[in-house]
Amino acid sequence: LYDSAKQLDGVFHLTTLMCAKHRSQMLETIRGRLKNGEPCLVIATSLIEAGVDVDFPLVMRAEAGLDSVAQAAGRCNREGKRLPEESFVWIFQPEAQWKAPAELGLLSSVMRSVVRQHAGNLLSAEAITDYFSEVYQLKGVELDQRRILAMHHNAGSSLNFPFQTIAAKFRMIETHMQPLIIPFDDDAERLIESLRHADQIGGLLRKLQPYTVQIPESALDALLKAGRIEAINEHTFGKQFYSLIGLDLYDEVAGFSWEDMAFLKGESLVL
């Protein structure tokens, strides 16, 4: 989608494959253009729904669950400076070649049902209650596949909660992700060099955080075998810290990109 629109004036892309420092710079530019009334079209993944403080007159969101739609709507007229009739949130169905995952398809189906019932007040408490009630009914025991709630319930009378077992079983995202440090600018390169010679991590980890992206563990292994990343100070810290070698795989528009890396299998690239 971005590739088809990038020739237009004021088109930007936001993704979790950009390090936080990169995203911050992009957002600063985006906010400036919005403030000045300049053309501004942002094509983003769902990361923009996670509390990003931007205010658009129009938001277009691919079909998803009502909670995701509500989060996307929060980027429209966020500052309340426009009249409601001048603020628009459009929900669209992607074309067939961009078929959504089965999980998202179910949530979208429930959302459409709620739209039919609450078309005039989609973000009301009643609409949101109806949405989650139907989702819970359809998903049933699938919501607690690891029986965490059952363990909590069984331990309730004795207060002997198996916290360690619950912590081991609970995982919001099943895919194992690993941080990769991006030598995005001179500051990042200096921090990486400091890490090479550090005996203790100290405050370096916090300073490096804005320069990391999260990638699947399998992709990290493939990148390492291909010589595109390196372990930093492995003697001291083991296999904790990896850095991208150069910026050939990091695009100034789209962030970390591996489109030309044929050795990475498709299933390793799902983010």
What are these regions (language model features)?
Residues 1-2:
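Conserved interdomain linker/interface between the two RecA-like ATPase lobes of SF2 helicase motors
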Residues 5-24, 31-32, 60, 64-65, ...:
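C-terminal helicase lobe and adjacent C-terminal extensions/tails of nucleic-acid helicase motors
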Residues 11, 42-48, 52-56, 178-183:
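Beta-edge loop/turn motif
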Residues 25-29, 46-47:
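Well-ordered alpha-helical segments embedded in enzymatic catalytic cores
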Residues 33-49, 61:
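Conserved two-lobed SF2 helicase motor
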